[in-house]
Swiss-Prot record:
Organism: Wolinella succinogenes (strain ATCC 29543 / DSM 1740 / CCUG 13145 / JCM 31913 / LMG 7466 / NCTC 11488 / FDC 602W)
Record CDD domains: RfaE_like
Pathway the protein contributes to: Nucleotide-sugar biosynthesis; ADP-L-glycero-beta-D-manno-heptose biosynthesis; ADP-L-glycero-beta-D-manno-heptose from D-glycero-beta-D-manno-heptose 7-phosphate: step 1/4; Nucleotide-sugar biosynthesis; ADP-L-glycero-beta-D-manno-heptose biosynthesis; ADP-L-glycero-beta-D-manno-heptose from D-glycero-beta-D-manno-heptose 7-phosphate: step 3/4
Upper lineage: Bacteria, Pseudomonadati, Campylobacterota, Epsilonproteobacteria, Campylobacterales
Catalytic activity, as annotated: D-glycero-beta-D-manno-heptose 7-phosphate + ATP = D-glycero-beta-D-manno-heptose 1,7-bisphosphate + ADP + H(+); D-glycero-beta-D-manno-heptose 1-phosphate + ATP + H(+) = ADP-D-glycero-beta-D-manno-heptose + diphosphate
NCBIfam families: cyt_tran_rel (TIGR00125), rfaE_dom_I (TIGR02198), rfaE_dom_II (TIGR02199)
Presence of the UniProt keyword DNA repair in the record: no
Annotated Gene Ontology cellular component terms: cytosol
Role, per record: Catalyzes the ADP transfer from ATP to D-glycero-beta-D-manno-heptose 1-phosphate, yielding ADP-D-glycero-beta-D-manno-heptose.
Keyword Nucleotidyltransferase: yes
EC identifiers of the protein: 2.7.1.167, 2.7.7.70
Originating gene: hldE
Protein name as it appears in the record: Bifunctional protein HldE
Length: 474
């Protein structure tokens, strides 16, 4: 799982800035004037919406955020700037355009259900003067950013000129541009790093009805090719997230209760940008974004998800205990760096763990007690065969990794193919290296790379070889 990092990526968010206005009340009667509900208002609230909600999500993830967009000379515009100031954000990139209203969406909520929405907005393209001012600001800030998000709600801010200018400038500086798109014509996004349309939006853009894995792959490939993307992503609501890098993968949804899907797309693109800016692979970023979205849809209104909420949600829903803990070498190296930055003690051990038994479990429990985070290096199938012979392993590396990742003592599992874990230890840089008591008086591989080596006695009479012999004997 992507952890809170001492490294704070700087992300520029450009798009349609909005105010989300909520009127909360109760409904107990029908109007005598017309067959409509009467809402007894109890309170009202205003929050940041649209591209501003993307910013709020990034701030909740502890990223540094720069903003760029257009507001009107009105109360909603002044309120929006005030909300951003409360979040500690500067507003130099926000342009005020005379005669143009600030977008505000008013929602009436009764008994935790949305009854109706009223919109104040102007969807026409912004003026050339506003375009020029936005581009000038972005040009001055882009070199300071790790990534750019274009949050398009179709309100006229992200014109073809603005989009293409940003994408070309970002390419020159080797910065990623992530787009939450709107409309049928995606040509203005061509050359971006990735798009995050939902299933309906993807169908409108590609003409492909997504109803199975084959059509999902076709739509993702179409978007990647036609828009010249680095990756393609489609959000699938209750079916999770579909991603395509070199191959298709669908990340299943983990939402338990859905109260309001408002702003879930904002959470997804913010989480993807955050993870990619820290150097995580797309798959892990999608897993993280999926979990963040699950937190958000369990709240009313445009909401955000913190690292703590995401971790708690994954733990309570028993998700990520397997797929989130089995990592590549590159990913575990980044995660180990994050643990160290938080002052945590990293423990490493390794082995084949072919047929898991009580001796293994006790050994791993004692290893975990040596620090805060236990990383297990698991010999690949090829590595086990070289060590144990052609009849081993009994269980595949995928099965062995999954079983290990389900143990409470194990934080992460990473498979290695070499005969020894030396290079893996070098990459992780653990504080403590743990081996079995049978290494007493022997050289421990990787001992020169760590501060401390701990030898732990195995539970007597328990071994995989003994289990295999017992099975063969029966």
């Amino acid at each position: 799982m992507i952890l809170s990092s001492s490294l704070r990526p700087t992300i520029l968010v450009v798009g349609d800035l909005m105010i989300d206005h909520y009127i909360w009340g109760e409904c107990e009667r029908i109007s005598p004037e017309a067959p409509v509900q009467v809402i007894d208002v109890k309170r009202e609230t205003k929050t940041l919406g649209g591209a501003c909600n993307v910013m709020s999500n990034l701030i909740a993830l502890e990223a540094s955020v720069l903003s760029c967009g257009v507001v009107g000379e009105d109360l909603a515009g002044r309120e929006l700037l005030g909300f951003l100031q409360e979040l500690g954000m500067e507003s130099k990139g926000i342009i005020t355009q005379k005669g143009r209203p600030t977008t505000q969406k008013s929602r009436i909520i009764a008994s935790n259900q949305q009854v109706v929405r009223v919109d104040w907005e102007n969807k026409s393209p912004i003026s050339e003067e506003s375009e020029e001012a936005m581009i000038a600001y972005i040009r001055s800030k882009l070199s300071l950013c790790d990534a750019v998000i274009l949050s398009d709600y179709g309100k006229g801010v992200l014109t073809p000129r603005v989009c293409q200018t940003i994408i070309q400038m970002a390419k020159t500086l080797q910065k990623r541009v992530l787009v939450d798109p709107k409309g049928r014509d995606y040509s203005k996004y061509r050359g971006a790093s990735l798009l995050t349309p939902n299933k309906k939006e993807a169908k409108e853009a590609t003409g492909i009805e997504i109803n199975d894995e084959a059509s999902l792959k076709k739509a993702l490939e179409c978007l990647k090719k036609e828009c010249e993307l680095e990756f393609s992503v489609i959000t699938l609501s209750e079916d999770g997230i579909g991603i395509f890098d070199q191959a298709l993968e669908r990340i299943p949804t983990i939402a338990q209760e859905v109260y309001d899907v408002t702003g879930a797309g904002d959470t997804v693109i913010a989480s993807l940008a955050y993870g990619l800016s820290l150097g995580y692979p797309l798959r892990e970023c999608a897993l993280f974004a999926n979990a963040a979205a699950a937190v958000v849809v369990g709240k009313i209104g445009s909401a955000t998800a913190t690292h703590g909420e995401i971790a708690e949600y994954l733990h309570s829903s028993h998700q990520g205990e397997s797929q989130e803990r089995i990592l590549s070498r590159d990913s575990i190296q980044k995660i180990a760096k994050q643990w160290r930055s938080r002052g945590r003690k990293i423990v490493f051990t390794n082995g084949c763990f072919d047929i898991l038994h009580a001796g293994h479990v006790q050994y791993l429990q004692k290893a975990k007690a040596c620090g805060d985070c236990l990383i297990v290096g698991l010999n690949s199938d090829a590595s086990v065969r070289r060590l144990k012979g052609e009849l081993r392993p009994i269980n595949s590396q995928e099965d062995r990794a999954l079983v290990l990742s389900g143990l409470e003592a194990v934080d992460y599992v990473v498979v290695f193919d070499e005969e020894t874990p030396y290079e893996l230890i070098r990459a992780i840089e653990p504080d403590v290296l743990v081996k079995g008591g049978d290494y007493e008086g022997k050289e421990v591989v990787g001992s020169d790379l760590v501060k401390e080596v701990k030898l732990i006695e195995f539970l007597e009479g328990r071994s995989t070889s003994a289990v295999v012999k017992k099975i063969q004997g029966s």
